[in-house]
């Protein structure tokens, strides 16, 4: 047993175990111990839990705006609700339980609970409950619920479908229509704003003699089993919950009933699901030698990154995954910058699917640009079903006055578009997938370049183009000019567009130009911008100013001293009147993020100087920030500092270190971008993996806390396994059809033209 945190342990490096029940941790543990499969996320709650315990099943592609303000994914009726009464007394979880253990088995995506509790009649009741969301049947989540008594007693099990579920911003389903089938019940309802049909069907079987009586009321339907528990003889209830919507199939009820009819036993479905998880881990697992806590924390994060990612069709990865409705189940820049790299190097088809979502929603980006007076594609800061902007104008409240704060995430944070162009270019660079560029990528990059050209302001007195009234990754400083990260990303996009204009075959280029109406005058403008756009460069001290006027702001070091200026603990720190706005205190990596994306852009000395300048000015109040600093610290051989940030990042959810409410808005749930970044910290950070031009670069560093680590990466269709120990680095080409690859290991050029190459450290 290895201790992760208070009452939190692991046995094998594949399990998370909590051995104390704490009612106050319902939000956190509901997220941490959740199950999912990219189609749905079922929170890690218990069978008897309702909305007061934040029980919910969140389903992809069910966006709705029930309250007229927030468009978010719907929580669907819960078909696993099971209530136990023993001799008339309800079984209710107590912090005084005789024994309690809950486990998340990362290896196969199973969450479980085993609890023993003494009832008023003297019987000690033991419940063993486990659930999983099937990767074999992505519309199904299954539960096995076993109850045992140490003495003979009467019991009642109420099990069915709970319609009255937890939802952050209104009830999204209406007009619930009940129906039954041979092995259970079902319900069909419609979303409020889009009128999409959602069907939930349950199957139910009990392995004991019991009388059965159906029930139906406005809050749900199901059946009541009345039975006698014999001392020492367990009774098991097996349930499946099957979910379909009209966004998946034409007739959700028929499809759900058909799947229910062919559902196998819990153990058979669990075995099939285990095979699917074996395959998933063969792609994504990163092993750490001789540090089981870091190992399990890393796997915990990778697990949550996996289950948050839709793979059944092109849909976004939500900023809170499918753990809750916070951030609306929609994509931010996180998707391409923090989540996609793991897929890019481990399972490129998923990376392709992520980018296809951005192509599918290109019209939404065009609509946003046009609405705001621009051309081309200005991608939504918060993007859901259609790519239209979901980010409200008023995201936070001023907790001092109670008034809404007008934030400008949705109209000033323009870097979202060049970030997507960056992801397209990086995908092509790593995979060599020319077909994607022809069919999707070129159109996206050209439309983003078109947007940037329409946004840029030409300053005749300075003879240059500038990007004004923007907001960089540091969200506390809005309405700034020439944010260094934004301007660099814009130039990267224009360069990518220019390269495509020169390298695409004539037929493809003509077709894309005709499709989007791209003129020669526009192309000339792009090339003029390439030559004359202002890009902040290192000053005489080697520092890149984050934005115009940043140096004029008040210096507060360390940055967290700014918290002493708060009047109320939960007030918003940022624009327009937060305590950081007139200071150099920044929310998260901004200039430093530039070095994460472009590790070869500046020399090491420049990176070091900027790291040392910005790190003490960074609050790290975004879950995205520690991972960015970890990656860059590893690049410049601040290995132990990188390791400290690695630990901080991978423990954000496990140890619940980030706030659930900011500026009066609920932002709880799993931090999906930090989950994805956990993989990057090892592979791109400590491993130093990058692709620059046609070559692969590796510069592996090893924290003192580890004896070694191993990861896989797919580059140009070749699967590499990188094994790092204290003595050496071994790179093995695991591909069946091996091809020569040019490597740069610590800057020394090598050609991997055999099975493996070994270098001393």
From Swiss-Prot:
InterPro entries: 6-hairpin_glycosidase_sf, 6hp_glycosidase-like_sf, Gal_mutarotase_sf_dom, Glyco_hydro_65_C, Glyco_hydro_65_M, Glyco_hydro_65_N, Glyco_hydro_65_N_sf, Malt_Pase/Glycosyl_Hdrlase. The active site is at 475 (proton donor). It comes from the Bacteria. Changing residue 587 to A: Abolishes both phosphorylase and hydrolase activities. The keyword Transferase applies. Gene3D superfamilies: 1.50.10.10, Glycoside hydrolase, family 65, N-terminal domain, Maltose phosphorylase, domain 3. GO terms for biological process: carbohydrate metabolic process. Optimum pH is 6.0-8.0. One of its GO terms (molecular function) is metal ion binding. Keywords: Glycosyltransferase, Metal-binding, Transferase. Pfam families: Glyco_hydro_65C (PF03633), Glyco_hydro_65m (PF03632), Glyco_hydro_65N (PF03636). Substrate binds at residues 333-334, 587-588. It catalyses: 2-O-(alpha-D-glucopyranosyl)glycerol + phosphate = beta-D-glucose 1-phosphate + glycerol. Glycerol binds at residues 327-328. The keyword Metal-binding applies. Changing residue 475 to A/Q: Loss of function. Its EC number is 2.4.1.332. Belongs to the glycosyl hydrolase 65 family. Catalyzes both the (1) reversible phosphorolysis of 2-O-alpha-D-glucopyranosyl-sn-glycerol (GG) from beta-D-glucose 1-phosphate (betaGlc1P) and glycerol and (2) the hydrolysis of betaGlc1P. the betaGlc1P hydrolysis is a glucosyl-transfer reaction to an acceptor water molecule that produces an anomer-inverted alpha-glucose, not a phosphatase-type reaction. In the absence of glycerol produces alpha-D-glucopyranose and phosphate from beta-D-glucopyranose 1-phosphate. This is 1,2-alpha-glucosylglycerol phosphorylase. It comes from Bacillus selenitireducens (strain ATCC 700615 / DSM 15326 / MLS10).
